[in-house]
Amino acid sequence: CACLVGSEMCIRDRPYAIKDYYDVDPDLATSIPDRMKEFENLVKRSHKAGLKVIIDFVPNHVARQYGSDAKPEGVTDLGEKDDMTKAFSPNNNFYYIPDTKLEGNIDLHRGAAEPYIEFPAKATGNDRFDAWPNSNDWYETVKLNYGIDYMNGHSRHFEPIPDTWVKMRDILLFWSAKGIDGFRCDMAEMVPVEFWGWVIPQIKAEHPELIFIAEIYNPGEYRNYLFNGKFDYLYDKVGLYDTLRAITCGWESATAIPQRWQSLGGIEKRMLNFLENHDEQRIASDYFAGNGSKAIPAMIVSACMNTNPVMIYFGQELGEHGMDTEGFSGRDGRTTIFDYWSVDSIRRWRNGGKFDNKFLNEDEKQLKQFYTRLLNICNSEKAIREGVFFDLTYANLAGWVFNEHKQYAFLRKQDDELILIMVNFDSIPARSAVNIPQHAFDYLGIHRYGEYEATELLTGNTEKLTLMPDKTTPVLLDGMNGKILKFKL
């Protein structure tokens, strides 16, 4: 298990953009002068508790007023030596709009007596290369220059190595030396893959156990960032997340699940699965399922269908609604990342540091118990942690008992342990029956047919079930729920 710690950022009004890559946000400290020591102690405590620490690394953009107060001796600030008369130079850290002041269709006062002044204007983090960003742009950020001249055919200038590459490598090495275990790289595909392929091997040469996770949304670039960029894992947002959300909401058939993993063509073990993150709407929000427990089938699939990692967003296990009307963020089904705020479910669970569940309601307690059991199953069961996967959808199409549009089933196998996982995306309980084809028995090396006593791992209950090639195995499923049935072969 790993805990993801937010970027080493400083907040400036609405934005939450990096002001200093070498510092810890003072707002997160108990004692501001000791904030770096507190971070180092957090890493040590996490390791002592059996956790690993992954921090957020935002390589594409920084705050417009970036300036490091905490950089090590001898380090030159980003932009400090830029030639601001040039729109692009491989030696610059930023992109400029020469001889032009930042104007923008935005409020440059933000309550201040004098407007914010920037001359010359810099390009925004979302690739706006003029001086007129609007409120839909990442106007509070400026894009870092990795040697691509976007305004001249995206021409690449990587020889000699651009200065930004060296600066960002040094930043990664700085945090790696703190004993962390990995980086979640924000919007990694907005940074050239050549940089990642250059920097990740250098970081791993000194810290071989570190992992790199890329936030990436373009399936056409997956292999590029895995094999040329050297990432360990990629976000599976536009594939499995979008599919499971659509099935949970009743917009899509469960038969879409095998289509999604098959489309990955063998890299599915390199994908990071999730049902919530800071950019997406909460499961329990009015914009998604309206109730955290309705995603139990999707969560079982996301966590158990392969050996790849799964991510849980804080409060997801409590069914946090994300329906507060926060300041800048507003009532959008997400927990704000822009405002000072208190998350209701987390606050009640925390209970002044007691973490005793006293102020959680029964639904929250039950959902938390489900997540606790599920994640422990993922770590403790060898067939799920290391085993092979066999999708049963193709053998259960157009059945009169198994509803392939609302139910999904698959097998996991390792050594003499077999696990049958079935979920029901329907709100109505199902008296289902799954057909396990002869090919599954052959592929998984199951040689004994007949009756078994299976243990349902989420509840601990036992069931007598018959495993026979091309014969249906009856399984009762509650609405919006699932079973994880373990057989000892």
Identify what each model region corresponds to.
Residues 1-6, 11:
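Single conserved hydrophobic/aromatic residue that forms the stacking wall/gate
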Residues 12-30:
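N-terminal substrate-binding region of glycoside hydrolase catalytic domains
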Residues 17, 31-35, 40-43, 64-182, ...:
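Alpha-amylase-like alpha-glycosidases and glucanotransferases acting on alpha-linked glucans and related
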Residues 25-28, 59-61, 187-191, 216-218, ...:
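Short, flexible loop/turn elements at secondary-structure junctions
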Residues 42-59:
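Hydrophobic or amphipathic alpha-helical targeting/insertion segments
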Residues 256, 265-268, 277, 282-452:
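Loop/helix patches that line or flank the sugar-binding groove of alpha-linked glycan CAZymes
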Residues 450-470:
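Solvent-exposed beta-strand/loop surfaces of large extracellular or lumenal domains
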Residues 465-489:
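C-terminal beta-strand-rich structural cap/linker in extracellular carbohydrate-active enzymes
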